[in-house]
From Swiss-Prot:
Motif window: GMN motif: 360-362
UniProt binding sites for Mg(2+) 3: G360, N362
Protein task: Magnesium transporter that mediates the influx of magnesium into the mitochondrial matrix and regulates magnesium metabolism. Also permeable to calcium, sodium and potassium ions. Required for normal expression of the mitochondrial respiratory complex I subunits. May play a role in maintaining the inner mitochondrial membrane potential.
Assembly notes: Homopentamer.
Lineage: Eukaryota, Metazoa, Chordata, Craniata, Vertebrata
Species the sequence originates in: Macaca fascicularis (Crab-eating macaque)
A cellular component annotation (GO) from this entry: mitochondrial inner membrane
Positions on the Mitochondrial matrix side per record topology: 63-339, 402-408
UniProt-recorded name of the protein: Magnesium transporter MRS2 homolog, mitochondrial
C-alpha cells in the first residue's frame, strides 16, 4: 500500500515528464482501454499493444515537443510584455507629422530589421539594412525609408523646435535643401546632416569667443602674475574643445567610410531599388549614386572646415601655454636673481662684520677709549662690504650674460 501511495510522486521522476503530461496520457489510455475490456482476453491484448504504442518513445517525444513549444510561447510573450516602448515621430514626403508609441519588437518586425539595429549607440554611424537607412548621431536616432522618416525617442532632447518647425518644411521641399528634385531619402539625409553640422557649428561658436577672451587675459603683458581662475576656465574650455574635435572626427570618418565604398553609396539610394521609374531615370541620365556622393562630399568639406577652425583654436591654446610658461620662468628667474643678490650682500656684510667681533672679545686695548675709532671701524665695515658686494654683482652679471651667436 505504501508503494502505491508513493507511486504518483515517483512516476514523474522516473519518466522525466511533468505530472500534467502524464495525466493527459493516462486519460488517453483509459479512453482506449474501456472498449477493450468488453471484448475478452484478445481485446485486452490488443488494448495492451495500443497502450504500449501510446506510451512509446514517439508519443512521449511529441508530448515533450508540445511542452517545449508552450514554454517558448510563454517566454516570447513575457519578452514582448517587457520590451521597451519607443516614441516614434513619423514624417512623410508632404511634411505631415504623426507621433505614436510602439514596442521595440513590433517596430523592428514592421521595418524588417533586427533587434541590434535599433540599439542606442553614442557613436555616430550610417548603416543600411533591408532597404532602410539607420542614422545614429549620439542622442538622435533616425530610420529612413523610401516613403517616410522615423525619429525615435526625441523626448528630453530639446529637439521640438527643429522637429516640428524646420524639418517638415525641409522634407516637403519648402526649405533650402539642394536635393529637393531627388527622391525622399536624399532630402532626409541632407536634413539630418545639416542639423548635425549646425549643432557642431553652434558648439564651436560658443567655445571660440570664450577661449579667445581667456587667452587675451592670460597673455596680457600688463599682468605680472597669472590668474588661476582664468587657467581653470581655460582648462574646462580645452576639454570641451577636445570633445568637439572628437565629434567632428567621428562625423568625418563615418562619411569617409561611405565615400570609399561604392556599394554603400548604391545602397543609400533606396528609391532606386524599390521604384522602377526611379531606377529607369537613374539608368538613363541622373545617376543617384553620384548625387549621393556629391551630397556626402559637401558635408565632409563642411566638417573639415570645422575641424580646421577647432585645430586653430588648439594651436592658439598651445602657443598661449608656451607664452605663459615663458612668463612664469622669467618671474622665477627674477626672484632667483634677487635671492642671490641678497645672499651675496649678507656674505659681504658678514665678512667685514668680523672686525666688530674682534672688538667684542675680552681683549685689552686702548682703542675703545677713543670714540672716533668706533665710527671709523663702522665706516670701514660698510665700505668694505659694499665694495665686495659690488664686485660679486659684476661677476654675477658677467656669468649671466647671454652668449653671442656664432659667426657665420
Amino acid at each position: 500500500m505504501e508503494c502505491l501511495r508513493s507511486l504518483p510522486c515517483l512516476l514523474p521522476r522516473a519518466m522525466r515528464l511533468p505530472r500534467r503530461t502524464l495525466c493527459a496520457l493516462a486519460l488517453d489510455l483509459t479512453s482506449v482501454a474501456r472498449p477493450v475490456a468488453a471484448c475478452g482476453r484478445a481485446a485486452n491484448l490488443v488494448g495492451r499493444s495500443r497502450a504500449a504504442q501510446l506510451c512509446g518513445p514517439g508519443r512521449l517525444r511529441v508530448a515533450g515537443e508540445v511542452h517545449r513549444l508552450r514554454t517558448s510561447d510563454v517566454s516570447q510573450a513575457t519578452l514582448a510584455s517587457v520590451a521597451p516602448v519607443f516614441t516614434v515621430t513619423k514624417f512623410d514626403k508632404q511634411g505631415n507629422v504623426t507621433s505614436f508609441e510602439k514596442k521595440k519588437t513590433e517596430l523592428y518586425q514592421e521595418l524588417g530589421l533586427q533587434a541590434r539595429d535599433l540599439r542606442f549607440q553614442h557613436v555616430m554611424s550610417i548603416t543600411v539594412r533591408n532597404n532602410r537607412i539607420i542614422m545614429r548621431m549620439e542622442y538622435l536616432k533616425a530610420v529612413i525609408t523610401p516613403e517616410c522618416l522615423l525619429i525615435l525617442d526625441y523626448r528630453n532632447l530639446n529637439l521640438e523646435q527643429w522637429l516640428f518647425r524646420e524639418l517638415p518644411s525641409q522634407l516637403s521641399g519648402e526649405g533650402q535643401l539642394v536635393t529637393y528634385p531627388l527622391p525622399f531619402e536624399f532630402r532626409a539625409i541632407e536634413a539630418l546632416l545639416q542639423y548635425w553640422i549646425n549643432t557642431l557649428q553652434g558648439k564651436l561658436s560658443i567655445l571660440q569667443p570664450l577661449i579667445l577672451e581667456t587667452l587675451d587675459a592670460l597673455v596680457d603683458p600688463k599682468h605680472s602674475s597669472v590668474d588661476r581662475s582664468k587657467l581653470h576656465i581655460l582648462l574646462q574650455n580645452g576639454k570641451s574643445l577636445s570633445e568637439l574635435e572628437t565629434d567632428i572626427k567621428i562625423f568625418k570618418e563615418s562619411i569617409l567610410e561611405i565615400l570609399d565604398e561604392e556599394e554603400l553609396l548604391e545602397e543609400l539610394c533606396l528609391s532606386k531599388w524599390s521604384d522602377p521609374q526611379v531606377f529607369e531615370k537613374s539608368s538613363a541620365g541622373i545617376d543617384h549614386a553620384e548625387e549621393m556622393e556629391l551630397l556626402l562630399e559637401n558635408y565632409y568639406r563642411l566638417a573639415d572646415d570645422l575641424s580646421n577652425a577647432a585645430r586653430e583654436l588648439r594651436v592658439l591654446i598651445d602657443d598661449s601655454q608656451s607664452i605663459i610658461f615663458i612668463n612664469l620662468d622669467s618671474h622665477r628667474n627674477v626672484m632667483m636673481r634677487l635671492n642671490l643678490q641678497l645672499t651675496m650682500g649678507t656674505f659681504s656684510l658678514s665678512l667685514f662684520g668680523l672686525m666688530g667681533v674682534a672688538f667684542g672679545m675680552n681683549l685689552e686695548s686702548s682703542l675703545e677709549e677713543d670714540h672716533r675709532i668706533f665710527w671709523l671701524i663702522i665706516g670701514i665695515m660698510f665700505m668694505g662690504s659694499g665694495l665686495i658686494w659690488r664686485r660679486l654683482l659684476s661677476f654675477l652679471g658677467r656669468q649671466l650674460e647671454a652668449p653671442l651667436p656664432p659667426m657665420v
